[in-house]
Amino acid sequence: MEPCQLIERSIIKKYRKELWTPFIVAVKRYELVQAGDKIAVCISGGKDSMLMAKLMQELQRHSDVPFELVFLVMDPGYNEINRQKIESNAALLKIPITIFETDVFAVANNSDKSPCYLCARMRRGYLYKKAQELGCNKIALGHHFNDVIETTVMSMFYGSQLQAMPPKLHSTNFPGMVLIRPLYCVREEDIIAWKRYNDLEFIQCACRFTENCTTCDNGGGGSKRQEVKVLLRRLKRDNPNIENSIFRSIHGVALDTMPGYKTEGQEHSFLERFDRVEAELQKELKEKQKQEADKTE
């Protein structure tokens, strides 16, 4: 059996419960793939996007729903070693990648703004644009379960809002394009276990700026996301179910208990509903009093 076949087998067999099953759960629960879709699977070269590419390949092979895949790699300015690593891994995993070049690293690193934020925004814009040029209606990104819960906690601690990472969303700048996150229910620890089991090596953040950056979200000691990772790891010792609780909480928001919320860019207050309910109660009370008065006559 070829190396690629063994790797594919590990997804379907050994790590079926950890990888394949939660992947399928996300695809079905959030309706990520529909008949006729042409999906650009966006590959950064890291473990998450490479696994996502293999999962999407397997889904296409075994699904009754017909859809197309394009495996898109944007080169933002990789050095030769990282570029070769991505290409060799794609060859090993038999992923037919389409590569296109941009100057994202150069622009982001010379900006006065947060380079990591700018890099992420520019990357997504280029991916949307290229995917649209190739006739795709969706792009797939490799955000996983842990990204979801960490983003939720970060928004509370540092963003002063309750905000999650949705499993799919419409692009505001590229009409007709949809972003999907097929790894939404897949845990990072299981991705790492699969990578190690198959003795695979992938690139991490390849930006030269992050080597000495203490505030970037690249997994370094100064990262806010890394702080949240450490916090959740510590809390998990006392409450092993804490990650599931956070994940389920964003699926069961009790909106009626919130003093304020925002939807479709509009802010709302609980007073809107409070006043409406009070008016309805007053109306019901008057009707009841009228009925009782009619009975006594």
What are these model-derived regions, one by one?
Residues 1-154, 158-162, 166, 170, ...:
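ATP-dependent adenylation/nucleotidyltransferase module used to activate substrates
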Residues 200-297:
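The feature marks non-catalytic terminal segments
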Residues 69, 146-232:
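Catalytic subdomain that performs nucleotidyl-dependent activation
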Residues 122-134, 168-174, 229-249:
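Short, basic, helix/turn surface patches
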Residues 49, 82, 116, 153, ...:
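Alpha-helix boundary/capping detector
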Residues 118, 140, 182, 186, ...:
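A short glycine-/small-residue-rich loop at the edge of a beta-strand within enzyme catalytic domains
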Residues 16, 20, 83, 124, ...:
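A structural signal for well-ordered alpha-helical scaffolds and beta->alpha junctions
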